[in-house]
Amino acid sequence: MSTAGKVIKCKAAVLWELKKPFSIEEVEVAPPKAHEVRIKMVAAGICRSDEHVVSGNLVTPLPVILGHEAAGIVESVGEGVTTVKPGDKVIPLFTPQCGKCRICKNPESNYCLKNDLGNPRGTLQDGTRRFTCSGKPIHHFVGVSTFSQYTVVDENAVAKIDAASPLEKVCLIGCGFSTGYGSAVKVAKVTPGSTCAVFGLGGVGLSVVMGCKAAGAARIIAVDINKDKFAKAKELGATECINPQDYKKPIQEVLKEMTDGGVDFSFEVIGRLDTMMASLLCCHEACGTSVIVGVPPDSQNLSINPMLLLTGRTWKGAIFGGFKSKESVPKLVADFMAKKFSLDALITNILPFEKINEGFDLLRSGKSIRTVLTF
């Protein structure tokens, strides 16, 4: 029996309070309005950005259904939807691509003005919500809310992908892989023969390593305080791995000594102000580029000496690896299907959706790279 046009009751992981476990609740998911799409979720990755919300470092309205890295199948569409249809395999896009705003029309940028990232309302683009739990409205997260068996997104925030793609793997293209890989190949534009430093070896950091290798970097120095991640980093392309706790001097000084004055490209993939500064300082003062990839704590500022940039350094950041989401995600999935890169090494744990709290515990303890939840 078709569910199109009807309210669907399903299970979702609701965050009612900060620093508390998720609660698996029965929620009602309203049908999609015009230019919206309702998706049956198949697989969702647990990303550090979701944990930043739980810990209070990333602010979004509560109660909320988190999750933003996922893949699923279109259940139904609202009036006027033309780019996807029921039955299509899709990836929701936490960075939409409306194609009409100033940012979308700029070939060098991807931070579409329809996003709900910078000053989140916790709604879809029309300012309303599609989730309720026992009659209480529940907020959306960055327009996608993938920790639910069903979700509703705007049409400009979903991409149709190859019908043969394995959703439990390509879900990582919805955030972690694309964010890291694109930061190297598209944002920094790593050059052949260059030297790179990558701070943080989670799923996104390892994807940066993969991007540096694909771009032809000669040296890729991986930096993390968890030595258990070094073997995986080397498997994916790191030429050296170092632990800042093994040195008495600041890690940026160690890296400068290792690289004749500094690396060509550095990446901060943790979200800490101290490592952002170390990443900037370790790149060469005359020609280095440092990229902020990790999500920084809310409402905290860095103070720097402008001379660090005057000498020739470049300091930049990007969301989603600089990729324009709706047009790039299908291409990235096609590249995966053509075996241009593998995602297997990034997925360390697969758990049923109901064990979401266990998955977050694995992330917090550093025992997982990516945990994928299956529905």
From Swiss-Prot:
UniProt xrefs under InterPro entries: ADH-like_C (IPR013149), ADH-like_N (IPR013154), ADH_Zn_CS (IPR002328), GroES-like_sf (IPR011032), NAD(P)-bd_dom_sf (IPR036291), PKS_ER (IPR020843)
Checking SMART domains in the record gives: PKS_ER (SM00829)
Q: Which cofactor does it need?
A: Zn(2+)
Residue numbers binding Zn(2+) 1: 47, 68, 175
UniProt: NAD(+) binding residues: 200-205, 224, 229, 270, 293-295, 318-320, 370
Under catalytic activity, the entry for this protein gives: a primary alcohol + NAD(+) = an aldehyde + NADH + H(+); ethanol + NAD(+) = acetaldehyde + NADH + H(+)
Q: Where in the cell is it found?
A: Cytoplasm
Q: Which UniProt keywords apply?
A: Acetylation, Cytoplasm, Metal-binding, NAD, Oxidoreductase, Phosphoprotein, Zinc
Q: Name one GO cellular component term.
A: cytosol
Q: Which residues carry this modification: N-acetylserine?
A: 2
**What are the recorded Gene Ontology BP terms?**
retinoic acid metabolic process; retinol metabolic process
Report the EC number(s), separated by commas if there are several: 1.1.1.1
Q: Report the PROSITE patterns cross-referenced here.
A: ADH_ZINC (PS00059)
The family database entries (Pfam families) matched by this protein are listed as: ADH_N, ADH_zinc_N
Provide the residue positions that the database annotates as binding Zn(2+) 2.
98, 101, 104, 112
Function field: Alcohol dehydrogenase. Exhibits high activity for ethanol oxidation and plays a major role in ethanol catabolism.
* Assigned protein family: Belongs to the zinc-containing alcohol dehydrogenase family.
Name this protein carries in UniProt = Alcohol dehydrogenase 1C
Q: What is the lineage of its organism?
A: Eukaryota, Metazoa, Chordata, Craniata, Vertebrata
Gene for this protein? ADH1C
